[in-house]
Design a protein with these regions (language model features):
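Alpha-helical protein-protein interaction scaffolds
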Residues: 1-52, 57
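Long, positively charged binding patches that form subdomain-scale interaction surfaces
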Residues: 50, 55-136
Length: 136
């Protein structure tokens, strides 16, 4: 087994979890692949309010963000959906990615279609591995 490679992968995942935590504390912004839609500002403002203990103000920003989203329909593994959102209300309709040592937000509204393999390892239930580009 190639434990050196596994150690590198887990090291990157742990570093990105620290980056993610800093983003939720409003200490660091997540990265974006494309310019984010305007409603992302309200999600980020909600994180900042939560970090300051201002839960009601955070809810106002989060609600404003959700109301501003116009289209989030698409396909995942061949099935269609009209709306998709993370179960973590802090990120809502954003896919969290860890790639190349970066913590990235990719709004579902910027994705047309997704495919994801079934989990093969226990860690796949925590961190979903990407498919190769030829499988997209």
């Amino acid at each position: 087994a190639n434990y050196t490679r596994e150690a590198q992968v887990f090291g990157e995942l742990i570093r990105c979890e620290i980056y993610r935590h800093a983003s939720f504390q409003s200490e660091q912004l997540p990265d974006f692949i494309l310019p984010p839609p305007p409603w992302i500002e309200d999600l980020l403002a909600a994180l900042a309010c939560n970090a300051r203990g201002e839960a009601q103000e955070a809810d106002v920003h989060r609600s404003r963000a959700l109301e501003a989203i116009t289209d989030i329909s698409g396909q995942w593994n061949g099935g269609s959906f009209d709306w998709i959102s993370d179960s973590d209300s802090r990120t809502g309709p954003v896919l969290e990615l860890i790639a190349g040592g970066a913590y990235i937000w990719l709004p579902f509204s910027q994705i047309c279609s997704l495919k994801s393999p079934r989990p093969a390892h226990l860690t796949d239930l925590i961190w979903k591995p990407p498919t190769s580009p030829e499988q997209w």
